[in-house]
Amino acid sequence: NSNSKFGYSALPYIKAMFPQIPILDYVHMEEWYNKNGGYSRYSAMYESIIDKTLVCNDNSKKILIDYFGKNKEEVETVYIGVDEKTFSAEKYNKEQLKEKYLGIEKNKKVLSYICRISEQKRPMLLLQIIASLKETRQDFKVMVVGEGNLLNKMKENAKKMHIYDDIIFTGNMKNTAEIYAISDVTINCSIKEGLALTSYESLSMGVPVVTADVGGQKELINDNVGKVIKLRQNEKDIYNEIYSNEEVHSYVDGINTILDNTKEYEKKCRQRIIKYFTIDKMIEKMSNILQKTYQGPNEIKIQNGKSLNKNLNICKELITTNLKNDEIEYRWECTEYEKRIYGRAYSMQGMNYKKEILKENLWKIPAWRGFIKILHKIKG
């Protein structure tokens, strides 16, 4: 199981029905702003029936053991790694791609920001970094690749800060390797990460990374392949968009250092991936763990499963309760979305909300409003 509330809720029933079959889960990171731990807390909650927990970095492993109390013998780090054959700069013509994406500005340096545009990724901090960087140099362009709930706000703020023309918003892209191919540095200013896949991909393409010191980022990024910037914001303040000047300037200094010494980083980035973090290394380690766990399932977990078999109704009710909670959360999210997009919430029962949304959209059209006013006068 990995990152699935439903999956965790179903584990007791699965273990009760098939106690001999070992269970493994994979935890990407802890999230203190999400149920005080996120999926790390779920993993600890179901420890008595999980044979092995895999994590994507040593920092998360330490937290699972020290904070959540998991058995250190049952937690192992398996770095995700990257397909170094797919993410290889040799496959791409940098000059042609810069012409494609930058046009007449193809001689500018490129900073890439590839992620979901949401609170966790701190896109508004990126804007402050760009604005501060622009005070000392204008030889760069920023590629923002991705979508999310803060994308429109990010664009609006970029216009207000007079840096919109320094940014290219591409939306979601399948072939992000093209962006890495034209990039001089990748920026990750997240408030929370496990170990970002984009950091693996960037290094594999020979592109250094400037990253926040979060999760296991510094297990991958060191001074030879980028810069690790101290996080100066409390994780619980994830919705606070006020950032310290010290943190902004630290990013600017790191970016400047890399942009002024690009050639020194390129080979070292690729070499670090090849030596330690290829996808083949991940497959080999994970296969060994799966084989070992399958051949020697934990007897205590087996007995726990047999005990659960005597209480199947509890296991079933756990699944039902989880599904009902998901339904409530979904309804709440729909309501919040409707408030944000349409200015009001539509009841999901007893109302033709599609008709109501159509009326709202028509009312935004001046000609329609004029027509309705005329009708009211005629009736009136």
Feature map (PLM): residue ranges:
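Short hydrophobic beta-strand element within catalytic cores of glycosyltransferases
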Residues: 208-211, 221, 228
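Aromatic "clamp/platform" in nucleotide-sugar-dependent glycosyltransferases that forms part
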Residues: 172, 191
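Short His-centered aromatic/hydrophobic patch
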Residues: 1-7, 27
